[in-house]
Amino acid sequence: ALFLGRVFQDPMTGTAATMSIEENMAIAARRGQKRGLGWGVTKKEREHYREALKELDLGLEDRLSSKVGLLSGGQRQAITLLMASLKKPKLLLLDEHTAALDPKTAAKVLALSDKIISENNLTAMMVTHNMKDAIAHGNRLIMMHEGRVIYDVSGEEKKNLKVSDLLAKFEEVSGGEFANDR
């Protein structure tokens, strides 16, 4: 788990609802380390968490002692994303991490994802059924059907893609029609 950071579809699964924001972040920050009988969160750590939360621009930096269960789904997902990237994993897995969010919040979490990935030079794999998001984010797009890769595109070809191109490619390769829910 030290080399993998992950954010799942359900905003409720990435955090401990009855714990505070800083307690959740402390657990994530200590992933892979021995835990002794010291203070739960030091002043230095608290300041580090405050600065990291400030970067999210959600007003959470002044709510470190707030229970995570009282936050919105988008706020929880943003914290989960931050927690997953605290230890700079070799791979950040984003498994439909915006599917349970409203469009405005999903867009904000995607922008935060892009920012965190870029600033920390992380390798990320985002699983999504949203074709627009698949095209707009990342530098490579892999389309799968029934457990196998049916399309793999990157570079200029990916930049020039449209949703209609992906749907046509799916129909061509799979022999079926794609039910687009977006």
What is each residue range found by the language model?
Residues 107-119:
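Helical segment within the ABC ATPase nucleotide-binding domain
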